[in-house]
Amino acid sequence: MVMAPIPQPWHQWPFLILFFLVLFSCESNLPCRNGVEATQRVFLYPQSPKVSSIVSKGYRTGYHFQPPKNWINDPNGPMYYNGIYHEFYQYNPNGSVWGNIVWGHSVSTDLINWIRLEPAIEGNTPSDINGCWTGSATILTGDQPVIIYTGADTEKRQVQNIVLPKNRSDPYLREWTKPKNNPLIEPVGPGLNSNQFRDPTTGWIGPDGLWRIAVGAELNGYSAALLYKSKDFMQWTRVDHPLYSSNASNMWECPDFFAVLPGKNNGLDLSAAIPNGAKHVLKMSLDSCDKYMIGVYDLKHDMFVPDTVLDDRRLWLRIDYGNYYASKSFFDSKKGRRIIWGWTNETDSTSDDVAKGWAGIHAIPRTIWLDGDGKRLLQWPIEEVESLRRNEVSHQGLELKKGDLFEIKGTDTLQADVEIDFELTSIDAADPFDPSWLLDTEKHCREADASVHGGLGPFGLVVLASDNMDEHTTVHFRVYKSEQKYMVLLCSDLRRSSLRPGLYTPAYGGFFEYDLEKEKKISLRTLIDRSAVESFGGGGRACIMARVYPAAVVDGATHMYAFNNGSSTVKVSQLKAWSMTRAQVNVRKG
């Protein structure tokens, strides 16, 4: 399809002046809260009265996971069993705010199109009467699936319970039963806070043949992943030391523990022998962010040992630098990969959520593996999402000089998948890097936004832009030189994403190290889904999930551009964009 030619800077100056002036005038926002709150709350939001709103339909996503209506938060117990993918989730069947939580349940054969089922777990026994919260699935020896989850008992203590499928011959595993010996694990022991003891992990087998799980906890005022052992997955004994603990924080939610191989995107099954050379990852949810450490699992001492110990948790690695929390991974035995899911909350108001009748989505499932140098996880949307692509638009060899803005036409800009390779013509133009920026990347993205000229960057995408550009979201790179290496900053700036008041509109950002002398180019992939903008920079080295609510989405008219506002010219060696058709997400009930 024929596209408009690349505009020359003098053709675009009135337009660009408006674009960069409105960027420059944005107010700053508080760092790293992401509009996300703790997932296991012991209070209920008051039910707001229904109000009329223009947001009732326009912002509902077309291919991200969400129930037909009401509130959703953490993904729970994802697994692949007998040809079916299962996704459980924290769900309020009675409203679009947090409360009345049960385990929703949906099934799929491709992780994209989903059939909804009746809730799998409800709080109706003494060990979960005050809440049935996050947990994990494990496939035991003999092909037996089980789920361990946190319940709030009659005393409102957080305890760990188990459920078993009532009929394993049912391909959808619709019904689950609770053994009478629940709870399996209680919050006993010195220094353990009974109200901060939750979210058990998937089980793994140690060198002694015993099963293990970790549970997030506050121990003596600090964060810990407590370690438990069992022969039969029913009788559990707490190990006398945590899997890992840190005095840099006071509570870890939703811990995850899994093995990865450097440079290989095949996943590892924790219930099988782990090959030599594998690394282990300990992921935790805190500060409204999902963070992780890479290290080794010391089998002799039954402990996780990180490669690098950082006392400042602001320097811990991030799964995602945007609105992404409570992630859960699982081994997909069908394709031999590890997949991770995360929850993305709304960042509009509670009254908006009530008016919409729904709140919360899950990010696109991502394949996750370890970079070849063993220093960082890489993430990429699962290949199945590509089945939704339609109407491909392609460009090669485009040149973007300082101030150039190139409109990408021929795709549905409300639901799109865009992949761009930016080729750098002069990496020597990179500005010097200041390590202090790592302590607050959002602040740096605000101060060095798309209106601020740099040596290399900003360059990237403008998405969900209104006709006159008074609403737009930028996803862009900046390149810096740090001693003998290059640091790349990926920003997703939401501060001009909407004219609507009362929204949380930060400038998200994250750095990653990149060998530009070898690669010479940086890739960007962005999935646009009405109110979701999900970006992957540098082949998945930095990921940013964002929620936006432009009025232009409701009007059904938005634009998308590639741009460069750096002093050095960048080339778009490859640009591909597709319209994304709507997935069948929980439309049908099974």
Curated annotation (Swiss-Prot):
It comes from the Eukaryota. Residues 1-28 form the signal peptide. It catalyses: Hydrolysis of terminal non-reducing beta-D-fructofuranoside residues in beta-D-fructofuranosides. The lineage of its organism: Eukaryota, Viridiplantae, Streptophyta, Embryophyta, Tracheophyta. Glycans are attached at residues 94, 167, 247, 345, 565. The active site is at residue 74. SMART domains: Glyco_32. Pfam families: Glyco_hydro_32C (PF08244), Glyco_hydro_32N (PF00251). Expressed in leaves. Expressed at moderate levels in roots and flowers, and weakly in seeds. GO terms for molecular function: beta-fructofuranosidase activity. It is found in: Secreted, Extracellular space, Apoplast; Secreted, Cell wall. One of its GO terms (biological process) is carbohydrate metabolic process. Belongs to the glycosyl hydrolase 32 family. The gene is CIN4. Induction: By rice blast fungus (M.grisea) 12 hours after infection. May play a role in sucrose partitioning during seed development and in stress response. Transmembrane segments: none annotated. Its EC number is 3.2.1.26. This is Beta-fructofuranosidase, insoluble isoenzyme 4. The keyword Glycoprotein applies. Its main location: secreted. CDD domains: GH32_Fruct1-like.
